[in-house]
């Protein structure tokens, strides 16, 4: 993400590593986004009681790889590769950065392809923000939100409708990207975060993704599920077995809106039975 300000009230919960070249000038603005995203992962439910998921608080290892709104995706993907190799103990990684340009209908972006390879080789999962609209003429999601192995999250309003800033999939015209949707803040109800100078009300897919990272981390690190099963559990909870969304709805919402409460994800309804079956198919 962008940089992190260690002076905030939850600073002790975050292990911070600044990966940006010291020769580059850093402004106060560069610390806002990264600090806000961390506040959701660490203490989101206290800041937003209506989004209390029952997952508790999380420790964060934060790597500052970008400053301002302009950054080189090549440099960042190279750094991500290095970071993952040196932090094998972390299974869930949140990426709330993305390109303004639209993805291509005919191939996966270079950044997404690299992230897919990293996930496969290291047995980890990325949670990626579905990218925001920089202007009205940009409609499709931007890289790396076309990463197939990642959990891509789009944003909805408190009422469960698509936000003004959300962009749409699909990836390669048939992969459901985004995978799911979650609450990212809007005029009806913004997301409360903690920035370096205090509390702020924000909106964006960047602020929907960390909530899903919390849930994935709970399923993987607390309940001990593997990443494929954890991802499948969230997708399954987002969409009822008898729902049949149109391709347009899938392009905007993915498989649906993930329930707020963790209990609604791990517990089944009275008239349902859920089996978790997983294995690796050998040749």
Regions found by a protein language model. Give the residues of each.
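Subtilisin-like serine protease catalytic core
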Residues: 2-18, 23-73, 121-123, 147-149, ...
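Short secondary-structure boundary/capping segments
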Residues: 11-17, 75-79, 109-113, 140-144, ...
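Predominant activation on well-ordered alpha-helical scaffold segments within soluble catalytic domains
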Residues: 38-42, 112, 116, 181, ...
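Flexible loop/turn segments at secondary-structure boundaries
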Residues: 5-7, 69-70, 100-104, 134-137, ...
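C-terminal subdomain of the subtilisin-like protease fold in secreted/lumenal serine endopeptidases
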Residues: 221-283
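Secondary-structure boundary elements
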Residues: 6, 47, 85-90, 117-125, ...
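Substrate-binding/access-modulating region of protease and related hydrolase catalytic domains
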Residues: 65-145, 201-203, 207-208
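Extracellular S/T/G-rich loop segment that most often corresponds to the catalytic His/Ser-adjacent loop
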Residues: 1-5, 9, 140-217
